[in-house]
Amino acid sequence: MMKQRSAFSYAKYGYLFSIPFIIVFCIFNLYPTVYTAILGFTDCKGLGNTDWNFLVDEPFKNFVQILKNPSFITSIKNTFKIWIMNFIPQLSLALLLTAWFTSHRNTLKGQGFFKVVFYMPNIITAASIAILFNALFGYPMGPINDLLVSSGMIDSPFAFIDNKFATQCIVAFIQFWQWYGYTMIILISGVLGINPEIYEAAELDGANDVQMFFQVTIPNLKTILLYTLITSLIGGLTMYDIPRLFNDGKPDNATLTATMFIHNQAFKGSYMYNRAAAASLLIFIIVAICSAFVFLLMRDKKER
């Protein structure tokens, strides 16, 4: 009886310690999310305007207006395009580095140093990275242009930042460069969790490094790969800082992303909070659908 009371007394402390988190979550996460969802069905406009009414006659008016807005469609296309352009090489390089660092036959000296170097871009602030790459690709004077002209690869300086495709490629490269180290660390942690006896058995069967990587490592990393894909998808579809700070969506909305569109609706022009809220809900639905699709695609055959 005393043991049960003691267990209960200890258990209640867990609830007490979780109270601060619950309070902060409700104030800064749950309440803004619910309030944003409500605003999507109202006529709320204007900075500091607290008077708004529900759109009773046309409750989905804001959503229709957003879907009819060409800039919103462009922002969705740009977001997916930039994410795909950076995620494929990001995952490929992260897998290659993971295989290199976790090889059971060739132990690399100074692994800790290389891991820190590869992870370093992830801890640099977005503002610093945007300023750095803006200077690197400056026109007409910039290190990249100077290098290309002096090497004879181009005859005259090229305006990278004024070219739509070039700007998208630069933003995608920045995202790739900033996050491949983080993805590598996640994958390495997954590989270290695989039972070493599996590799020993594969080695006894005569499997080489390539065969062990594709037939042992990759199948056992399925859960980690799913996590990486989902988190990258969510982060990619909500990217804001680099496109905003690098070129502010220019030229001609080439790097306008979905979250930048939402920001522009809410804090530029007519301060259409209702349209911004509706766009946020649409992005949430798109992310949820894409995530569910990835889960269904990567689930085990036994679960189907």
Where do the PLM segments sit?
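A structural signal for multi-pass alpha-helical bundles of membrane permease subunits
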Residues: 5-304
